[in-house]
Amino acid sequence: MAAAVLGQLGALWIHNLRSRGKLALGVLPQSYIHTSASLDISRKWEKKNKIVYPPQLPGEPRRPAEIYHCRRQIKYSKDKMWYLAKLIRGMSIDQALAQLEFNDKKGAKIIKEVLLEAQDMAVRDHNVEFRSNLYIAESTSGRGQCLKRIRYHGRGRFGIMEKVYCHYFVKLVEGPPPPPEPPKTAVAHAKEYIQQLRSRTIVHTL
């Protein structure tokens, strides 16, 4: 009986020793590896720059250039970045840069850098003749990696804090910006609401 207990203790001691050795050498088992979707960052946004369109017909108007650019893993909140991204949506590139120049938020400086990079990319890689002949067709933010860390409190207590990151995506299109849509009237909102009610379907019926 004593020999069996000693054998179990010895096996447990060897197992603990191996696990400590793995941690010391930086070799973690697969169960400790972070495999969430935030680390699996897709590169689909930049790949849109490589789309090859078919040749245009002789009398067809020239297709405007489209520039996709982004910056990832920004140490900033995605919600705070979204307000700035929505602010410049639909503006010309010069107007957007002017708006961001006089905004004292941290995200405004980051978005301005991304817009200048996209503007240089348009002239260099997409055959855009005039740097100012661009407008912001799409501007949005996304959630990045979220890391949990310990926040030390008094009397031996602690809390969990989150270090959040975000992504910023922008699409520039060659040409003047489209005119803004007129605001909907109350009658138009009511008609749209009535149409939605009439378009409803009953679930699990023909």
UniProtKB/Swiss-Prot annotation:
- What would be one Gene Ontology cellular-component term for the protein? mitochondrial inner membrane
What InterPro entries does the record point to? Ribosomal_uL22, Ribosomal_uL22_bac/org-type, Ribosomal_uL22_sf
Q: Where in the cell is it found?
A: Mitochondrion
One of its GO biological process terms is: translation
Q: Check the record and name the Pfam families matching this protein.
A: Ribosomal_L22
Range of the transit peptide:
1-40
Is Ribosomal protein tagged as a keyword?
A: yes
Query: Domain of life here?
Result: Eukaryota
Q: Which UniProt keywords apply?
A: Mitochondrion, Ribonucleoprotein, Ribosomal protein, Transit peptide
Q: Show the disulfide pairing.
A: none
Q: Name one GO molecular function term.
A: structural constituent of ribosome
Gene3D superfamilies attached to this UniProt entry: Ribosomal protein L22/L17
Q: Which family does it belong to?
A: Belongs to the universal ribosomal protein uL22 family.
Assembly, in brief, is: Component of the mitochondrial large ribosomal subunit (mt-LSU). Mature mammalian 55S mitochondrial ribosomes consist of a small (28S) and a large (39S) subunit. The 28S small subunit contains a 12S ribosomal RNA (12S mt-rRNA) and 30 different proteins. The 39S large subunit contains a 16S rRNA (16S mt-rRNA), a copy of mitochondrial valine transfer RNA (mt-tRNA(Val)), which plays an integral structural role, and 52 different proteins.
What name does this protein carry? Large ribosomal subunit protein uL22m
Question: Which species does this protein come from?
Answer: Homo sapiens
Organismal lineage: Eukaryota, Metazoa, Chordata, Craniata, Vertebrata
